[in-house]
């Protein structure tokens, strides 16, 4: 019963919760089909974990106010901000019933990652560039530096080309913002990039040597790839390219707005449905602990609520 409760109330996908608990899917669904004693009074089974009307209204209110959030993101946001826990699947059912479900979103997965996993912020940064078109101006290149562990975008700028000078400018911005040159050389970050001419140039190598940052080059067709940053660039393009831009400053402003949203507001599934800023600043463990507490409190409150409904139905029959 405890496992069924945990799976039903978790904001995470059912498959992920079962994997974390070490319970096979076949076993879970066999348990789910068993009649429960608590369900028998009053005739047919009544879901013990049914949301109360105020909880359903809260789900709809948040969904209508923030239509850009997916069901997964809504479930996490509600758990963090509304004092009760709700699963992604429950959010989906409520929105579908009300005709608020968006068309299926394309799930873009990161490519293979660098073979050595980072375990804390600033162990390794990644940098890459992606092109955007400005009407009448041609192509510009968004150069980004991202922290590998937290996926926090440390620096970004729209550049006219992909020369070493353009790359150095953005990396230096990340160095300045983090105070990386004040860190002992042995503890400084490394930088992962592809083999673009600007990155493999002597000027770029000399710059990294000057600031004490070790350069890691991603070998083609090798697991040392830049998948996280490539995935990020796909995501920002999906958002920013919904509108045409006639001057570079408008595109730069749109990119900056998305970066702020991505870093501080967007729940990232690969990070445990917290934001990159939460991970960068060491808040993830506390947030996940609070969610577990909210989940437990919600389970107990919802169990009492639905038991009362069953007792009232039995008494009136």
Q: Model regions: which residues?
A:
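Acidic/histidine-rich, metal-coordinating catalytic segments
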Residues: 171, 180-200, 221, 226, ...
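Basic, flexible linker segments flanking DNA-binding modules
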Residues: 32-124, 223, 280-284
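Short, amphipathic alpha-helical "recognition" segments used to contact nucleic acids or chromatin
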Residues: 1-12, 56-65
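Short coil turns linking two alpha-helices in DNA-binding domains
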Residues: 23-24, 87
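Mobile-element integrase/transposase regions
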Residues: 84-85, 89-146, 152, 165-188, ...
